[in-house]
C-alpha cells in the first residue's frame, strides 16, 4: 500500500539545463550548464495548482499534462507514495525548445521533487531512468541529474515490449572549460529535426564519429586543446543544416575561426566549448543578428531542498 505523505511538506528543486551530443556523441554525451529552472512543490489538502513564471509562461499547460506534474507523479509512484493534492510553482530560466535541455530539466525536476517529498528513497540511477523515459534518450536528463559531463546509453528490450533501460556515468571535466550558447529567437522541434536524419549511415561516417567521441571524452577530462577535433560530427549535424540554416551558418563561421562550435541537442542553439572567453566582437555580431548570448559554466547536479511544515 502506498504511503500518503503529509500536507504541508514542501521541496524546492534547482535543476540545470544541459547540452546534448557535444558534436559526435548523438544521444550519448551530455553536459550540465549553469542556466537553471527552480521548481517549488508543496503537498496541499486536495487538487492541483500550477503556476509558471519566466520561460514558457502563458504557453505551457497549467494542469496535469504539464511535464513537471507528470514527472512528479511518476516519481511518487516509483517511491510508493501518494499525495492528496499538489501546488507546483515553476520559475523557468532555461530557454525552451532551443536545444538546452528544458524538457529534460522539467522531467528531472519533477522526479527529484517527488523523491524529496518522499524522503529520498530513489537512487540517482532510478531518477535517471524515470526522467529519461519522458525523453526517450538519456543524454540531457542524465547530465541534469548527475551534473558535469556524462556518457549515457540505452538498452532496448529484446521483446520490444518492456521499458527501455537508460543509464549514464559521469565524467570529470577540466575546471577551465566553459560554454558559450548562441540562442536564436525561434524554436526547433526535436521531432521535426530528427525526421531529416537518414535511416542508414556509411561505415566510414560511423567510424569517424566513434573516434571523435573518444577524442571528446579525452578533451573534456584532460586535453581541452582537442575540443575542436572532439566536436566534429558526420552523423546528424550535416543533415540538420538544411532545416537549421542560421545555426549551421554560425557553427561553420565559428569553427572556421578555430572555435569548438556545434549544434546543441536538436538546436537551434549553437554551442561553443572553450577555455578562453569568446572575443566580444564575435558575441556582439551575434547579438546584432538577434541572437541571445549566454556565457555559461559547467554545472553540478540537481539540488533538492526540503522545507518541513
From Swiss-Prot:
EC identifiers of the protein: 2.7.1.39
Superkingdom of the source species: Bacteria
Catalytic activity: L-homoserine + ATP = O-phospho-L-homoserine + ADP + H(+)
Signal peptide residue numbers: none
Major place of residence: cytoplasm
InterPro entries for the chain: GHMP_kinase_C_dom, GHMP_kinase_C_sf, GHMP_kinase_N_dom, GHMP_knse_ATP-bd_CS, Homoserine_kinase, Ribosomal_Su5_D2-typ_SF, Ribsml_uS5_D2-typ_fold_subgr
Annotated metabolic or biological route of this protein: Amino-acid biosynthesis; L-threonine biosynthesis; L-threonine from L-aspartate: step 4/5
Keywords: Amino-acid biosynthesis, ATP-binding, Cytoplasm, Kinase, Nucleotide-binding, Threonine biosynthesis, Transferase
Enzyme class: transferase
GO molecular function: ATP binding; homoserine kinase activity
Family matches, as Gene3D superfamilies: 3.30.230.10, GHMP kinase, C-terminal domain
GO CC terms of this entry: cytoplasm
Pfam families reported for this sequence: GHMP_kinases_C, GHMP_kinases_N
Compartment(s) where it occurs, according to its Swiss-Prot or TrEMBL record: Cytoplasm
Residues at which ATP binds: 95-105
Gene Ontology biological-process annotations: threonine biosynthetic process
Function, as annotated: Catalyzes the ATP-dependent phosphorylation of L-homoserine to L-homoserine phosphate.
Similarity comment: Belongs to the GHMP kinase family. Homoserine kinase subfamily.
Name of the protein described by the UniProt record: Homoserine kinase
Amino acid at each position: 500500500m502506498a504511503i500518503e505523505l503529509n500536507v504541508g511538506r514542501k521541496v524546492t528543486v534547482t535543476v540545470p539545463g544541459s547540452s546534448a551530443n557535444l558534436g559526435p556523441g548523438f544521444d550519448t554525451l551530455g553536459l550540465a550548464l549553469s542556466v537553471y529552472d527552480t521548481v517549488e512543490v508543496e503537498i496541499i489538502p486536495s487538487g492541483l495548482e500550477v503556476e509558471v513564471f519566466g520561460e514558457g509562461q502563458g504557453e505551457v499547460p497549467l494542469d496535469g499534462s504539464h511535464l513537471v506534474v507528470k514527472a512528479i507523479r511518476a516519481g511518487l509512484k516509483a517511491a510508493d507514495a501518494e499525495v492528496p493534492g499538489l501546488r507546483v510553482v515553476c520559475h523557468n530560466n532555461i530557454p525552451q525548445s532551443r536545444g538546452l535541455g528544458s524538457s529534460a530539466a522539467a522531467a528531472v525536476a519533477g522526479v527529484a521533487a517527488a523523491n524529496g517529498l518522499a524522503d529520498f528513497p530513489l537512487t540517482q540511477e532510478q531518477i535517471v531512468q524515470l526522467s529519461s523515459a519522458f525523453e526517450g534518450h538519456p543524454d540531457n536528463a542524465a547530465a541534469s541529474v548527475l551534473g558535469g559531463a556524462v556518457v549515457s546509453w540505452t538498452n532496448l528490450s529484446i521483446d520490444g515490449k518492456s521499458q527501455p533501460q537508460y543509464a549514464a556515468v559521469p565524467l570529470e571535466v577540466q575546471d577551465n572549460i566553459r560554454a558559450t550558447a548562441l540562442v536564436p529567437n525561434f524554436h526547433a522541434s526535436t521531432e521535426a529535426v530528427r525526421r531529416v536524419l537518414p535511416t542508414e549511415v556509411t561505415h566510414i561516417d560511423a567510424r569517424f564519429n566513434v573516434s571523435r567521441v573518444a577524442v571528446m571524452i579525452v578533451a573534456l577530462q584532460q586535453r581541452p586543446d582537442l575540443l575542436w577535433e572532439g566536436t566534429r560530427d558526420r552523423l546528424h549535424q550535416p543533415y540538420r543544416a538544411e532545416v537549421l540554416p542560421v545555426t549551421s551558418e554560425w557553427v561553420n563561421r565559428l569553427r572556421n575561426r578555430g572555435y569548438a562550435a556545434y549544434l546543441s541537442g536538436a538546436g537551434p542553439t549553437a554551442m561553443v566549448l572553450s577555455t578562453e572567453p569568446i572575443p566580444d566582437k564575435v558575441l556582439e555580431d551575434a547579438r546584432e543578428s538577434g541572437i541571445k548570448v549566454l556565457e555559461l559554466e559547467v554545472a553540478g547536479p540537481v539540488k533538492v531542498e526540503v522545507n518541513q511544515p
